[in-house]
Amino acid sequence: MDFRTTCEETKTGVCLLQDGNQEPFKVRLHLARDLLMLQEQDVLCVSGEPFYSGERTVTIRRQTVGGFGLSIKGGAEHNIPVVISKISKEQRAELSGLLFIGDAILQINGINVRKCRHEEVVQVLRNAGEEVTLTVSFLKRAPAFLKLPVNEDCACAPSDQSSGTSSPLCDSGLHLNYHPNNTDTLSCSSWPTSPGLRWEKRWCDLRLIPLLHARFSQYVPGTDLSRQNESQVVAVDGVCSGILQCLSAEDCMDWLQAIASNISNLTKHNIKKINRNFPVNQQIVYMGWCEAREQESLQDRVYTPVFLALRGSCLYRFLSPPVTTWDWTRAEKTFSVCEIMCKVLKDSDLLDRRKHCFTMQSECGEDLYFSVELESDLAQWERAFQTATFLEVERIQCKTYACVLESHLMGLTIDFSTGFICFDAATKAVLWRYKFSQLKGSSDDGKSKIKFLFQNPDTKQIEAKELEFSNLFAVLHCIHSFFAAKVACLDPLFLGNQAATTAAVSSASTSKAKHLA
């Protein structure tokens, strides 16, 4: 793909578009800050206000050297009309100003050749006389196999040599000599050109894809099969770009990264606007698309697009992005960020051919598997989840869970400042208390019981404490969240990034970070 980058937010290039069952054809992509434009070439009359005209009639004379000054490809054998594939410099076809590469020849001297084979059209043009009148119409979606140049400035030099053979996929130069004695010459009728009209080939909008909350993918929908050098972009309203085919994997990745960057910038800007309407404890940290892997799917579609959002204390899973306040109450699923475990997967842990995956284990032990498109998307998600967890732990400071110790109802408080506190649920009397730094290990039975191994600060001996919970995974994940927040407080880089993120999503000042007790 040939492209030029005008600035960080814009990019222009030419690629192929596979739209439904049609043959791929050339389109121009133009990436703006908030829009991806797909454009196709067309020929417009630009005398006065530009307008489309389906057909043009052009009369040109044959030259001794160079003939008509054009070459053709295609034909009925490929289910398309014959198309002008080259126009020679400073020859009759170019000087007329009315013929363009990509024009389909519909009539020759009034004879309908729309459904003629390539060689038949060549013969008609050979025998057309010194002057020929062509009725043409620009073939906007010329199949890519014709390999037509995008621009008119092809290096096609005039020649007076003739060819005895022609091929529908090779340029047949129509500079052939006129044969006046040929009895098969077809009769002519007068088709005058339109005086005073000027025509130009231009790129015209074919499809507009708004980028706010748009998604893109290199994979065949619902599968882990990656298309080679291909991708598609889908707008939030479901409008799809079609399959965009690049010349190389590098070009494809350049486009995906540029599109992803613009989508990300739009999302961040939108989050800032939405957060003005939410209190400090309900600020949005992240919004974006990913694909969820369906567990034990019996259908061909293993992956389904889902929209994830981190807001306040919750992770929301939507089928489509929330637009109104009411939409936030209709999430497909909602999880407490402190009670879920997120893990970015290494290549050796992936379940299939999709890269850039992460898992989440819910508070009830359900394992969820997600895929994103780019490595940068995965890094962005990981940072956002860490930030959301940190902010929530800082906000709540402590979390208490009911538990059972030797058939007695107890409570376990996980406190960000002091550590672990176990107390009698009835009397509130504290049974034991340990700091986070005293926890040297733990184990669980995967059902309800957790065994904590604490180090006594005086004797240095390990003391085992076993508690039974009705919500085992929620407790385990909450403990992990508090430990992660403690570790984050010791990381200057994280604290710097977290401060910037907090300032972006909230006007409230960040509470002072507490260090490991």
From Swiss-Prot:
Record domain PH: where: 283-390
Example of a GO cellular component annotation carried by this entry: nucleus
Domain notes from UniProt: The PDZ domain binds to the last three or four amino acids of DGKZ. The association with dystrophin or related proteins probably leaves the PDZ domain available to recruit proteins to the membrane.
Localization (cell): Cytoplasm, Cytoskeleton; Nucleus
Superkingdom of the organism of origin: Eukaryota
MF annotations from Gene Ontology: actin binding; structural molecule activity
PDZ domain location: 57-140
Protein name: Gamma-1-syntrophin
Keyword annotations of the record: Actin-binding, Cytoplasm, Cytoskeleton, Nucleus
Function summary: Adapter protein that binds to and probably organizes the subcellular localization of a variety of proteins. May link various receptors to the actin cytoskeleton and the dystrophin glycoprotein complex. May participate in regulating the subcellular location of diacylglycerol kinase-zeta to ensure that diacylglycerol is rapidly inactivated following receptor activation.
Subunit structure and binding partners: Interacts with the dystrophin protein DMD and related proteins DTNA and DTNB. Interacts with DGKZ.
Protein family membership: Belongs to the syntrophin family.
Record-linked Pfam families: PDZ, Syntrophin_4th
